[in-house]
Amino acid sequence: KNHALVLDDCMLERTVRGIVNSAFGCAGERCMALPALCVQESIADRFVEKLLEISKELKIGPAYDKTTDLGPVVTESHKKHVEGWIQKGVDEGAKLILDGRGATVSGFENGFYIGPTIFDHVTEDMEIGQQEVFGPVLCIKRVKDFEEGLRMMNDNEFANGSVIYTSSGYYSREFARRTDGGMVGI
């Protein structure tokens, strides 16, 4: 499970666009997808507002259509698997702020489509924020500061990659030095 840490000095629009691409590109079915974010509380509301705005603009459609932003998941059984995880997140009490279940595409009504799905206020004890969903599902964990965000990221057993969004040279260096992610993005 790859993580990003979003600090309050990030370039907001650029950060959100990068995260949307990483979380929802390839329907979230790639090893380097970004399913989990630790967002500094002081920027979280503005971040979530912009994230919803951009995510709702994504065009869902067949993968071969060059205007498509979000294609289908690979199989019907995987669609059911991802939808099961979405329900699990709801049952655990995560705040579902964008629900991609029920997405349809005209002419492809039997396709395996799931729209962008975003949970906010995910806590450390929720499985939705700990396990690999492997679909277009993004979990937001609100954190007080760099230290809490880094700790949450490092406490997760999965760490293909990790990325920080900040304008701070200090936090960039600290992140690169201290993250457990296999690949590091700054």
Segments (PLM) and residue ranges:
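Conserved C-terminal structural/oligomerization subdomain of aldehyde/semialdehyde dehydrogenase
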Residues: 5, 10, 59, 86, ...
